[in-house]
């Protein structure tokens, strides 16, 4: 065995062994307990960043631990390969998105291998490959046949110069990123999947997810946002038709003083036809962002249409206003407005001088001037005719009953969740498998004609999608008649909503899934990824799983049993500000930090010019803050095991991990020390088989530390996952080993057990060095196939224990006692201590309190 630790050599040997033996290949083994561990697959952006490294290290550590528990472990890896960044990179580098994507995949795959992640590469998939998206297209046609897919008009960002649809991130300050033109809102037909049909299931089944973070479940509950309310109609005054609204507060119906409609509402368009000012206002609204977050903060603006509704219960007229905060996509595009009891309605009414009426009074609340502030709480009805005096809950039911009896309303459950719009007017995505016949009817592409292939050898002009620009690409035939292929592509969340299932049978050519394989592996036992995916990805995956279940492809209700959301990797930021407050950020490696003589008040200087830079807050590693660290450089300098060990030691998985070069160096020293201890031990030769009965007290103490380490690591893996505290325990064990000087046969046997334990419990975290050291410790088998060390509870028992002795609650002595000592023996030992006797002189003992294993407290006066 070499005396010094050479990470590169050690890691190459281990990786060569895993590659040559296909060590992580797994198949279904009925009768053997399975464990499916999955980390969210990456977008192939070009290089791994530290966020990737942390995510995949956590997943690999869990997988390797479960393998040592004797389970059949599946840990696959693939690529979420479609998306807008590939189109942008293609333009920038003058290369086709496909070529750019496949080159990135090759580079990043090699990086993952260098980090020693135990993936079954036989199952690798890339979502941009036709053999993958073929089955997504087929599944979409099945949903269409079941009535779960439909097409409707929907609002998009339209660039009038480039004549193209822009993604939200391509709209910068209201202008197109490429043309600089003012972006318009435009209605175009788009495909939707009826996720709302599954809203109740998606909500209720959150209760089944016992091992998901409560925060994620709350975010999904709020996103689905089930509400009970009343849907009813206002008749229009001097106009045919009516206006449908939904409210969760029918108790406030007598306080309606106006109705607000969306700028795209047919009534708004009708009114604008004879009102140029209103037409201009509607045009301005076209350029308004429609994200809810934007709606909440933007200025509320509106205009009177000149139309009125008739209040269904008072028969009084109320004006209809167009308001820029009402969305056509939500409900019917109209809302009843009660400014006395809704803050947004109140703000709008004050701005435009609309009446404000109080119909709710809150008992025991301070008097509120309704003209100054809305009362949003529930309470007792006032000024409400026959409903006056009722509580809000009583009025809810009474108003609902009255509107139902009148035939103009009914109680209704509503969800904030909207159907999933899956159309994207981009090129680099899976083509939507629908065709339009000459008579305008839509038909799904038959299975025999799938996949609808995306051409990969294309030139990008930055304006139109190549498949939209090529008139020949969309020419198809259906039953011998001409048809036009849909040129929109799927939202990339489609691909990531079922990839976890395809990993169960990625090479199956005849079907989307093999139910036998899928039902053996699914649900995923442990899913690791960032909290930023709490809503969209995790909600869509749960939805897709239920769709797969209803198609008979899987028999479980939920895709992921346990979810771990890892924290961010954060690092220091350094910058300079120019006179216009524009910040230029510098990488921490290019900065020198100096402390004063007391080791405080840090100051930072740019190494290049020696001039000061501002020390900013610690923030998530990112390109924009220039505070990232290239994992490749760390692997080259310290080795993959050091990077993995730092990642697991610096913080528990759910918390933010603060980057520290000195911390990385510390972990590297620890591994060198482990290597040296094993080297010193194996050079001695002469360990006898361990005989517990023969051990002396010093040997038993070291063995106790060994088994305390096993207990701690096992507890952390099985419960809290605070592996950092387990690693700290291994460090303590190595400290004990460094101090242990006993080369007798049983002394060496205890050291052998301690070193084997250290190597085994660290094997999931630092697999390369463990692979090498396990062999050096005399084992024929490989450490990855070794079982997890067994805890000997007897080894944890202590012959003697230390107790604290207090006199009147103050510490006066520490005493050693036999672990088996009874209460009387402990009392005698305490009274015999000289220091204790000094504090009891000339005093009377009132009582003695003994807490076995901890303390003796003598109360005197």
Swiss-Prot record:
Motif ('HIGH' region) positions are: 42-52
Query: Primary place of residence?
Result: cytoplasm
Cross-referenced InterPro entries, in alphabetical order? Answer: aa-tRNA-synth_I_CS (IPR001412), aa-tRNA-synth_Ia (IPR002300), Leu-tRNA-ligase (IPR002302), Leu_tRNA-synth_edit (IPR025709), M/V/L/I-tRNA-synth_anticd-bd (IPR013155), Methionyl/Leucyl_tRNA_Synth (IPR015413), Rossmann-like_a/b/a_fold (IPR014729), tRNAsynth_Ia_anticodon-bd (IPR009080)
Q: Which SUPFAM superfamilies match?
A: Anticodon-binding domain of a subclass of class I aminoacyl-tRNA synthetases, Nucleotidylyl transferase, ValRS/IleRS/LeuRS editing domain
Alphabetized UniProt keyword annotations: Aminoacyl-tRNA synthetase, ATP-binding, Cytoplasm, Ligase, Nucleotide-binding, Protein biosynthesis
Reading the lineage from the top rank, the first entry is Bacteria
Q: Which GO terms describe its biological process?
A: leucyl-tRNA aminoacylation
Q: Which top class of enzyme applies to this chain?
A: ligase
The EC number(s) attached to this protein equal 6.1.1.4
Q: Which GO terms describe its molecular function?
A: aminoacyl-tRNA deacylase activity; ATP binding; leucine-tRNA ligase activity
Residue ranges annotated as transmembrane are none
Q: Which GO terms describe its cellular component?
A: cytosol
What the entry lists under Pfam families is as follows: Anticodon_1 (PF08264), tRNA-synt_1 (PF00133), tRNA-synt_1_2 (PF13603), tRNA-synt_1g (PF09334)
> Where along the chain is ATP bound?
623
Reactions it catalyzes: tRNA(Leu) + L-leucine + ATP = L-leucyl-tRNA(Leu) + AMP + diphosphate
Its subcellular locations are:
Cytoplasm
Residue ranges for motif 'KMSKS' region?
620-624
Q: Which PANTHER family match?
A: LEUCINE--TRNA LIGASE, MITOCHONDRIAL, LEUCYL-TRNA SYNTHETASE
Entry's HAMAP family? Leu_tRNA_synth_B
Family of this protein = Belongs to the class-I aminoacyl-tRNA synthetase family.
Instruction: State the name under which the record lists this protein.
Output: Leucine--tRNA ligase
Naturally occurring in which organism (per UniProt): Hahella chejuensis (strain KCTC 2396)
The record's gene field reads leuS
């Amino acid at each position: 065995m070499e005396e010094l630790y050479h990470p590169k050599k050690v890691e190459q040997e281990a990786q060569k062994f895993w590659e040559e033996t296909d060590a992580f290949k797994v198949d279904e083994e009925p009768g053997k307990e399975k464990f499916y561990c999955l980390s969210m697959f990456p977008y192939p952006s070009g290089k791994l960043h530290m966020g990737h490294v942390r995510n995949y290290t956590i997943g690999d550590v869990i997988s390797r631990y479960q393998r040592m528990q004797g389970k059949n472990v599946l840990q696959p890896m693939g690529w979420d390969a479609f998306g807008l960044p590939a189109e942008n990179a293609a333009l920038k580098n003058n290369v086709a998105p496909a070529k750019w994507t496949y080159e990135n995949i090759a580079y990043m795959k090699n990086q993952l291998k260098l980090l020693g992640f135990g993936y079954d590469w036989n199952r690798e998939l890339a979502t941009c490959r036709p053999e993958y998206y073929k089955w997504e297209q087929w599944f979409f046609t099945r949903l269409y046949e079941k009535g779960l897919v439909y097409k409707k008009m929907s609002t998009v960002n339209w660039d009038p110069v480039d004549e193209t649809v822009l993604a939200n991130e391509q709209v910068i300050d209201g202008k197109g990123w490429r043309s600089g033109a003012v972006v318009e809102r435009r209605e175009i037909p788009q495909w939707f999947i009826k996720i709302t049909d599954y809203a109740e299931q998606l909500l209720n089944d959150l209760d089944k997810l016992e091992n998901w973070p409560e925060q994620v479940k709350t975010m999904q509950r709020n996103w689905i946002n089930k509400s009970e309310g009343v849907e009813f109609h206002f008749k229009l005054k001097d106009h045919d038709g009516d206006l449908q609204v939904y409210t969760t507060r029918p108790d406030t119906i007598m306080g309606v003083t106006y109705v607000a409609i969306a700028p795209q509402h047919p009534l708004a368009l009708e009114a604008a036809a004879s009102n140029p000012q209103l037409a201009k206002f509607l045009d301005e609204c076209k350029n308004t962002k429609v994200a809810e977050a934007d709606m909440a903060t933007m200025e509320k603006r509106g205009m009177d249409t000149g139309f009125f509704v008739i209040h269904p219960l008072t028969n009084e007229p109320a004006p209809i206003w167009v308001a820029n905060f009402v969305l056509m996509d939500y409900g019917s595009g109209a809302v009843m407005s009660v400014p006395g009891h809704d803050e947004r309605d109140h703000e709008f009414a004050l701005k435009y001088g609309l009446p404000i009426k109080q119909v709710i009074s809150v008992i025991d609340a301070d008097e509120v001037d309704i003209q100054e502030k809305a009362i949003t709480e529930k309470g007792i009805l006032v000024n409400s005719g026959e409903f006056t005096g009722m509580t809000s809950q009583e009025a809810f039911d009474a108003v609902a009953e009255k509107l139902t009896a009148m035939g103009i309303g009914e109680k209704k459950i509503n969800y904030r969740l909207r159907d999933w719009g899956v159309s994207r007017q981009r090129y680099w995505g899976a083509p939507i498998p629908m065709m339009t016949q000459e008579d305008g009817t839509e038909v799904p592409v038959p299975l025999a004609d799938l996949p609808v292939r995306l051409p990969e050898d294309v030139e990008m002009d930055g304006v139109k999608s190549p498949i939209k620009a090529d008139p020949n690409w969309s020419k198809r035939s259906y039953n011998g008649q001409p048809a036009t292929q849909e040129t929109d592509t799927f939202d990339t969340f489609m691909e990531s909503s079922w990839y976890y299932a395809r990993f169960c049978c990625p090479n199956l050519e005849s079907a989307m899934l093999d139910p036998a394989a899928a039902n053996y592996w699914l649900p995923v036992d442990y899913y690791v990824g960032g909290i930023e995916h709490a809503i969209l990805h995790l909600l869509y995956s749960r939805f897709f799983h239920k769709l797969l279940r209803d198609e008979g492809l899987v028999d479980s209700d939920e895709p992921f049993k346990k979810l771990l959301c890892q924290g961010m990797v954060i690092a220091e930021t350094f910058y300079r500000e120019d006179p216009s407050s524009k910040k230029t950020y510098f990488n921490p490696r290019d900065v020198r930090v100096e402390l004063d003589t007391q080791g405080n008040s840090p100051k930072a200087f740019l190494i290049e010019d020696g001039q000061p830079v501002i020390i900013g807050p610690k923030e998530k590693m990112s390109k924009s803050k220039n505070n990232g660290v290239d994992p490749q450089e760390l692997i080259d300098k310290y080795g993959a095991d050091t990077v993995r060990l730092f990642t697991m030691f610096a913080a528990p998985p759910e918390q933010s991990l603060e980057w520290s070069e000195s911390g990385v160096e510390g972990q590297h020293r620890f591994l060198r020390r482990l290597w040296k201890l094993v080297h010193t031990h194996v050079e001695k030769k002469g360990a006898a088989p361990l005989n517990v009965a023969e051990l002396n007290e010093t040997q038993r103490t070291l063995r106790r530390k060994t088994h305390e380490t096993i207990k701690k690591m096992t507890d952390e893996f099985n419960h809290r996952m605070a592996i950092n505290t387990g690693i700290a325990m291994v460090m303590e064990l190595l400290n004990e080993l460094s101090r242990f000087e006993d080369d007798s046969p049983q002394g060496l046997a205890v050291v052998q057990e301690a070193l084997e334990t250290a190597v085994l419990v660290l094997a999931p975290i630092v697999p390369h060095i463990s692979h090498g050291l396990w062999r050096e410790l005399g084992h024929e088998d490989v450490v990855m196939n070794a079982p997890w060390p067994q805890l000997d509870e007897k080894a944890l028992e202590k012959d003697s224990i230390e107790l604290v002795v207090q006199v009147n609650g103050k510490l006066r002595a520490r005493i050693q006692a036999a672990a088996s000592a009874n209460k009387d023996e402990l009392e005698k030992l305490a009274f015999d201590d000289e220091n204790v006797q000094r504090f009891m002189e000339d005093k009377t003992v009132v009582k003695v309190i003994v807490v076995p294993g901890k303390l003796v407290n003598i109360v005197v006066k």
